[in-house]
């Protein structure tokens, strides 16, 4: 290794670095993106299942919203320990374990009959999935330099809007299996969308590599370059391995507050989106599914474009705050106006902005955390944020039951959008190197 470092000139090092990053990107990002896309489908397929399930099981909007949100309470409670266990046992073992257990529980949702069973299964699903997303973000930080991180995260994270596209396309046909083999359409949806998680857990187990130094699919020079490049990166606060110091950093909790606002808007809308769109347009479930699919494709383009520009300029805050502001206006328009296609357009814009701000937002912690402190810091931020995943859908359900419509809930989402923009602009972090 020492001889290699001495002989390698800057031009050769740049070529080795490009090759290493290209191989890592093509090896890891598709694997993790597909895993996260499957997870996201299992997390929010309940939004389509509810179109039949709530009627069959006599669930009110408040019961549905509370149960849907309990997933995030469990996720938040278990996230920090799960992410620390990932750091201890390695990403390959821990992420594969997460996928296996959540896949089995996602399939088990088909057996729900009462509100208590619904609450219990959603809670257990949150326990099972806890740590997957922050674990992946930590894992990517172990492989890619900070200057590329928003772009890398967006390529992984683009699985989220694309999974919405796939879910929108398949939900209608699955729900139309109503009565096949004596099962309701919503039961088929849970069964057939949970099975891929179980199967893909084996793929992660076989193909992931914990750290660059262990990657036998890289050359010796490429492994050496990645290890040295990542070890040489500057960090604002120098937390390193000091978890306690990282958790005392107010920026950790400020980013957590931004995530809280973000996830409140995300799941208040997305877990009710099919019902809102069906009510606004009068369309059937298949047509509503295609509306969701179209929004997913637009969101994927926005995510990649915003993340790429953020990396090229090295700027993070405005790439998060501006989408928050546009989203605020879009929710207000969707809630205050009644013209069906104006509502659809407003909600599509809100979704696109919501998805578009994610990668720059998630890239921020890498500017002041690293190592075990990053694992704990990201998990702590996401834990705070995940409470928005509980509050958003529950509040939307309560408002729907009391007013008979979703319009008031949509207008209320202006508040977390505005607060999220303000917290973002008040954040003080080192500007990332442009690339």
Language-model segments: which ranges?
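Extracytoplasmic gate region of multi-pass secondary transporters
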Residues: 46-47, 246-307, 358, 362
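Helix-breaking motifs and short loop linkers at transmembrane-helix boundaries and internal kinks
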Residues: 58, 90, 111-117, 128, ...
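Conserved MFS/SLC helix-loop-helix module at the cytosolic interface between two early adjacent transmembrane helices
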Residues: 77-116
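Helix-to-loop junctions at the C-terminal end of transmembrane segments
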Residues: 78-90, 302-315, 400
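Cytoplasmic membrane-interface "Motif A"-like loop-to-helix N-cap segments
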Residues: 87-99, 311-324
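Cytoplasmic helix-loop-helix junction between adjacent transmembrane helices
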Residues: 121-158
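Glycine-rich segments within core transmembrane alpha-helices of 12-TM secondary carriers
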Residues: 153-175, 196-197, 382-392
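C-terminal transmembrane helical hairpin of 12-TM major facilitator-type secondary transporters
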Residues: 316-364
